[in-house]
From Swiss-Prot:
Species of provenance: Bacteroides thetaiotaomicron (strain ATCC 29148 / DSM 2079 / JCM 5827 / CCUG 10774 / NCTC 10582 / VPI-5482 / E50)
Family assignment from sequence similarity: Belongs to the flotillin-like FloA family.
Protein name, as recorded: Flotillin-like protein FloA
Membrane topology of this protein: Single-pass membrane protein
Keywords: Cell membrane, Membrane, Transmembrane, Transmembrane helix
Disulfide bridge partners, by residue number: none
Length: 333
């Protein structure tokens, strides 16, 4: 009695679990949607996708979209292989459909290669149809007259599908355009000619073929704004003048130091000579005493020498100016 009571409950629970597992591993409604859309795929293939960890809700909608767009050569195996390789199936299918509608030549192999290279293949197709405008950051350059100019440009580019794999990106385009603007302004004779004809910059930059080796084709380069910056030439001249002044001051200080050193050296030599004179004068009394003892100097000779010294001292005193600004007058006889 109890077994017959629990049996329906077990069957119901088991049936619910079976249906959950069935619809999880076998997406019946997705298979039905594919059949209605004309995509040939079986329930066994959907079940095997689950076993291979390939989500059917990504592969089947892509197959339906490609089939509706007339791209019937795209197979389920190709989409599965691209997903397992780490690609974006939805973006690849969207890109192929957009390229087909826009008459852009794009194969499935090329689209998957672009996607696996890290590029947004759908955005690339959109850029091929609708060119993209890139605003450059302010580019600073100096004309030959020393005036600094700050320019901003707008670069219109179109994606080159064939160059997306291995081609340089937007940063390279911006760097090359900035280099071209700097070169064009730097070769101008003065800043006025640049302000009068800003299109000359665009023409010169376009002639350089800056899009070589990139994933884009440059359609146009337009100078959006040009501002006048600093007078770099005048600033450099001022800096040079200050440097020359500092050099001259340093040389003058060096000469002054040498002159002071030379003066001190001469004073030292004078002190040395004075010391020698004093030393020699100290020897005079000794020599006179020796002359007296040897009889070479008489008393009259000694007094005559003293008179000469006194006369010399008197003449020196007369020749010296007084503190009041007048000279000493000679004594009246």
């Amino acid at each position: 009695m109890e077994t017959s009571l629990y049996l329906p409950i077990v069957l119901i629970v088991g049936g619910i679990i079976f249906l959950i597992l069935f619809f999880h591993y076998v997406p019946f409604f997705l298979w039905l949607s594919a059949k209605v859309s004309g995509v040939n795929i079986s329930l066994i293939q959907l079940f095997l996708m689950r076993i291979r960890n390939v989500p059917p809700y990504i592969i089947v909608p892509g197959m339906i979209e490609a089939h509706k767009a007339g791209l019937k050569n795209i197979t389920r195996d190709e989409l599965e292989a691209h997903y397992l390789a780490g690609g974006h199936v939805e973006k690849v299918v969207h890109a192929l459909v957009s390229a087909s509608k826009a008459n852009i030549e794009l194969s499935f192999q090329m689209a998957t290669a672009i996607d696996l290279a890290g590029r947004d293949v759908f955005e690339a197709v959109q850029m091929s149809v609708n060119p993209k405008v890139i605003d450059t950051p302010p580019v600073t350059a100096v004309a030959k007259d020393g005036i600094q100019l700050i320019a901003k440009a707008r670069v219109t580019v179109r994606a080159s599908i064939k160059q997306l794999v291995g081609g340089a990106g937007e940063d390279t385009i911006l760097a090359r355009v900035g280099e071209g603007i700097v070169s064009s302004i730097g070769s101008s004779e003065n800043h006025k000619s640049v302000l009068e004809n800003p299109d000359s910059i665009s023409k010169l930059v376009l002639r350089k073929g800056l899009d070589a080796g990139t994933a884009f084709e440059i359609l146009s380069i337009d100078i959006a704004d040009i501002d006048i910056g600093k007078n770099i030439g005048a600033a450099l001249q001022i800096d040079q003048a200050n440097a020359d002044k500092n050099i001259a001051q340093a040389k003058a200080e060096e000469r002054r130091a040498m002159a002071v050193a030379s003066e001190q050296e001469m004073k030292a030599k004078a002190q040395e000579a004075r010391a020698k004179v004093i030393e020699a004068e100290a020897e005079v009394p000794k020599a006179m005493a020796e002359a007296f003892r040897s009889g070479n100097l008489g008393i009259m000779d000694y007094y005559r020498m003293k008179n000469i010294e006194a006369d010399t001292s008197m003449r020196e005193n007369i020749a010296k100016p007084t503190t009041g600004g007048t000279t000493n007058q000679p004594l009246s006889k």
